[in-house]
């Protein structure tokens, strides 16, 4: 059996970025053949990736890229299982690169993005290797690419909330509006963007509450309309009190700066993903089976 030296392990680790112990095991299995050991690691990481694929990836980051002229922008959400991995340098570098790829190469969907070249492989190939190295599932969840009427401003809060806002006019106020959106989480720019079924639900609830309170039948529609209007002010960007000056609405602030907001997009990491909950004993039992 060939002697496995520390230098060989180091060289294989530098080539594959795999953990030291995995490198040593692969070299031993390959009888010291570096190329065969590298192939073993690729297979092993692939197997690890397959094991991780069924686990819920509800943490992660949002990354943004904006063209030099500010007219186009892209935003990507990449998920992983734990916040610890969301801070991994390779994971963050991949996530940032994906936003640039979406901006410049305009892939049609996640599958097309995953097939693009990245670091002597493809996005999907690198993702699979990274899953194997880290031992956690990760996935490109969604992205958006936008062409604006004005210029895009952006805001990312802790890597977890990302906002793109399209504004004509004052660039400083555009940045403030992006921060406002992250804090207040409006559902749409104005009333025209709020789904009718959402308004119908608010109206029905308001009528039922008014009935239970003993309000006269003749007043029910008026009460419901008042409730809906209040709801619209709470969930539409232009009607919301501005976070930096709640005596003015966002619309009033924009007008005071001779600016106009054309639209926005917000991503919240893990939004809509059901996180798997398990107790400590179950986690230990699951780990013992791996």
Swiss-Prot record:
Compartments where found: Cytoplasm
InterPro entries assigned to the protein according to its UniProt record, in alphabetical order: EF-Ts_dimer_sf (IPR036402), Transl_elong_EFTs/EF1B (IPR001816), Transl_elong_EFTs/EF1B_dimer (IPR014039), Transl_elong_Ts_CS (IPR018101), UBA-like_sf (IPR009060)
GO molecular function, one term: translation elongation factor activity
Keyword Protein biosynthesis among record annotations: yes
Gene3D superfamilies xref list: 1.10.286.20, DNA helicase RuvA subunit, C-terminal domain, Elongation factor Ts, dimerisation domain
Listed PROSITE patterns: EF_TS_2
Keyword Protein biosynthesis listed: yes
Keywords of the record: Cytoplasm, Elongation factor, Protein biosynthesis
Domain of life of the native organism: Bacteria
Chain intervals for the UniProt region annotation (Involved in Mg(2+) ion dislocation from EF-Tu): 82-85
Listed GO CC annotations: cytoplasm
Broad class of the protein's primary localization: cytoplasm
Record function comment: Associates with the EF-Tu.GDP complex and induces the exchange of GDP to GTP. It remains bound to the aminoacyl-tRNA.EF-Tu.GTP complex up to the GTP hydrolysis stage on the ribosome.
Family: Belongs to the EF-Ts family.
Full protein name: Elongation factor Ts
Lineage summary: Bacteria, Pseudomonadati, Pseudomonadota, Betaproteobacteria, Nitrosomonadales
């Amino acid at each position: 059996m060939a002697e496995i030296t520390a230098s060989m392990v180091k060289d294989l680790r530098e080539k594959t970025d795999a953990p030291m112990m995995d490198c040593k095991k692969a070299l031993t299995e390959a009888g010291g053949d570096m190329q065969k050991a590298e192939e073993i690691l690729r297979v092993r990481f692939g197997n690890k990736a397959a094991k991780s694929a069924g686990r819920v990836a509800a943490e992660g980051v949002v990354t943004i890229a904006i063209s030099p002229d500010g007219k186009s922008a892209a935003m990507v959400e990449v998920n992983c299982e734990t916040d610890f991995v969301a801070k991994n340098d390779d994971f963050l570098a991949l996530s940032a690169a994906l936003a640039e790829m979406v901006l410049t190469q305009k892939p049609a969907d996640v599958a097309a993005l995953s097939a693009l070249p990245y670091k002597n492989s493809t996005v999907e190939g690198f993702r699979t290797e990274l899953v194997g190295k880290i031992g956690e599932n990760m996935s490109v969840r969604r992205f958006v690419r936008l062409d604006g009427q004005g210029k895009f401003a952006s805001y990312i809060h802790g890597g977890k909330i990302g906002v793109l806002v399209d504004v004509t006019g004052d660039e400083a106020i555009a940045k403030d509006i992006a921060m406002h959106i992250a804090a207040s989480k409006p559902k749409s720019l104005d009333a025209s963007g709020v789904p009718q079924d959402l308004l119908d639900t608010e109206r029905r609830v308001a009528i039922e509450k008014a009935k239970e309170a003993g309000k006269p039948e003749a007043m029910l529609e008026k009460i419901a309309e008042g409730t809906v209007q209040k709801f619209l002010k709470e969930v539409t960007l232009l009607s919301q009190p501005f976070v930096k000056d709640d005596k003015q609405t966002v619309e009033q602030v924009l007008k005071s700066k001779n600016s106009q907001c054309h639209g926005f997009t917000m991503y919240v990491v893990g939004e809509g993903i059901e996180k798997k909950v398990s107790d400590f004993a179950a986690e230990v039992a699951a780990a013992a089976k791996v």
